[in-house]
């Protein structure tokens, strides 16, 4: 698309004002109608990908819920506690220090902390709902595998490399809980 636009602009610069009637008569389709058609195509493609992703995610979660060791909450979050962790339990107002790996349901890694690196920190109340709910199930030092439905992740909008309506899988180690009362 960018190459087509670049070519059209070069042609415009060589032939005159792109808004003049004389210039527009040279084209079977106006640049505006081409742009509108392209945007319509993108919207239809995104809607199709969203529907396919939703169907695949629902199928994955339905099969996954039947696996031994997988528990399902009322919200639809699925999880496996690998290690329960200690007595210090996180709340939404706490800052958590975690190591994690996030994958799509096909196993494609879309984000992770460095394997030998430092954990990242974030306020629990500021992350996706699947993490908010799931990480409150383990204590400091615990490990959990989260299978997050799209509505508890990025929903219909998707996010950087994650298609709309995608279920996500996370392996998370809760390294430390920074209690809100201790941070003030």
Q: Model-predicted segments: where are they?
A:
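Cross-family detector of peptidyl-prolyl cis-trans isomerase
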Residues: 1-184
